[in-house]
Amino acid sequence: IFDEVQTGMGRTGKLFAYEGYGVEPDVMTLAKALGNGVPIGALLAKDAVASHFKPGDHGSTFGGNPLVCAAAFATIQAIEDENILTNVN
């Protein structure tokens, strides 16, 4: 499990901090920078882990609604389209 709440979304020069360590997490948490100021929480999991979740097993006060999902999408799109990570590195 990698907690990318503070380190994700390019803050370390990579989109996610784990990319700098040569490992790949089974589960990753995101928040804060993912929404670029809009409160959001997210849990990403590989299929082998996610397949064990059933409706109601996991919830988030700031996850899944249309506003925060649009904000997260726009944030990721801006990071990619504006080559922000190139400038960070």
Residues covered by each model-derived region:
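Conserved N-terminal phosphate-binding loop of PLP-dependent enzymes in the Aspartate aminotransferase
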Residues: I1-N89
